[in-house]
């Protein structure tokens, strides 16, 4: 007798090991960088703050937090069908993102060990945190009779090269938006405990503080490198990364609105709250933030949401490959145009809040 609960439509490398999700523009990326340039950075303009953050990392507040308790010791077969599939996809995306951070931070710690020991230790301790997160999420997947082969993921993924300053922008925003995502879900479920369908969400309050501390580290790094914040190019790049991170989250989450509905959340409202909070937080270090309260911002993102629905419909059709490609061209062009217009929207200058050593 086939147990359909165990395998809700997932491909497997081998029994119980899920094939990693196909890489797309919206899936978590794996990064590498110029390690020599990173090692040569002068961090003296903000060394005191970096040393204070290192001391926080050494304390390891969450050393005993990621321990599964008795609330996990039950069958989860009642989470079935589409809900089960959406939940496993959520765990996979989260695990992949955390594991990506682990690999980057671990390699930075190794490469900088003899050249910049302060930064090396910070990166090693952050990799410790990310490894815990990824392992905890992967263990959660096993409750649904699946897991990820993280060794296979390490070898099979394509790595995106970013210069150090782009790593700073991207990882700062990734950590801070991760904080706001986790704490927003936690606070909602704290008020609505009947919507907590699985105990991993009960760990999010302490968990998100790791994300917050990691973000503070990259905040301090950028303040030690004023050129990443204080010239006209920095403003353009900050705008680009803010838009990229916000748009990626919005397009991903609206596509998976049913998952958030399982938690009693409305995906768009949730995303708008997270984007607003992350945008405000970024204003403490970035010279500009996005005008996310301008109706044009979400109107254009909604056009992209609609376009992506059309792209998925074309992929699901039985048309020949050439016909599919031709049908997609105007939709890709529309998405590109929406992002250009979003990028050109006037940002909000917050220079008075940024660029100075705290």
From Swiss-Prot:
Pathway: Porphyrin-containing compound metabolism; chlorophyll biosynthesis (light-independent). GO terms for biological process: chlorophyll biosynthetic process; light-independent chlorophyll biosynthetic process; photosynthesis. SUPFAM superfamilies: Ferritin-like. It holds the Pfam family Rubrerythrin. InterPro entries: AcsF, Ferritin-like_SF, Rr_diiron-bd_dom. Its EC number is 1.14.13.81. It is an enzyme of class 1 (oxidoreductase). It comes from the Bacteria. One of its GO terms (molecular function) is iron ion binding. Keywords: Chlorophyll biosynthesis, Iron, Metal-binding, NADP, Oxidoreductase, Photosynthesis. Its cofactor is Fe cation. It catalyses: Mg-protoporphyrin IX 13-monomethyl ester + 3 NADPH + 3 O2 + 2 H(+) = 3,8-divinyl protochlorophyllide a + 3 NADP(+) + 5 H2O. Catalyzes the formation of the isocyclic ring in chlorophyll biosynthesis. Mediates the cyclase reaction, which results in the formation of divinylprotochlorophyllide (Pchlide) characteristic of all chlorophylls from magnesium-protoporphyrin IX 13-monomethyl ester (MgPMME). Belongs to the AcsF family. This is Magnesium-protoporphyrin IX monomethyl ester [oxidative] cyclase 1. It comes from Synechocystis sp. (strain ATCC 27184 / PCC 6803 / Kazusa).
